[in-house]
């Protein structure tokens, strides 16, 4: 018995087998539509932001400090 799945793009039935060239998609067109959605960021993988604006407050900086001409973290070695 073969497994049948729905095409993620158009919901058409797709038989999951070795000769299904575009699985899980039904066609190259649907595959490219999906790729375009990822490339244009319509599809994204949700992640928790590692940047916490409140952390700046704890360090004694505000966001404007990061746009100054002088880098407060610069040392003589990095010039």
Swiss-Prot record:
Signal peptide per UniProt: none
Binding site for Zn(2+): 7, 10, 26, 30
Cofactor: Zn(2+)
Record bears the keyword Endoplasmic reticulum: no
Keywords: Metal-binding, Zinc
Cofactor binding comment, as recorded: Binds 1 zinc ion.
Domain of life: Bacteria
Gene Ontology MF terms in the entry: DNA topoisomerase type II (double strand cut, ATP-hydrolyzing) inhibitor activity; zinc ion binding
GO terms of biological process kind: regulation of DNA-templated transcription
Pfam family, one: YacG
SUPFAM superfamilies registered for this protein in UniProt: Glucocorticoid receptor-like (DNA-binding domain)
InterPro entries, per database record: DNA_gyrase_inhibitor_YacG, Znf_NHR/GATA
Subunit structure: Interacts with GyrB.
Function: Inhibits all the catalytic activities of DNA gyrase by preventing its interaction with DNA. Acts by binding directly to the C-terminal domain of GyrB, which probably disrupts DNA binding by the gyrase.
Stated family: Belongs to the DNA gyrase inhibitor YacG family.
Protein name (Swiss-Prot/TrEMBL): DNA gyrase inhibitor YacG
Organism expressing this protein natively: Shewanella halifaxensis (strain HAW-EB4)
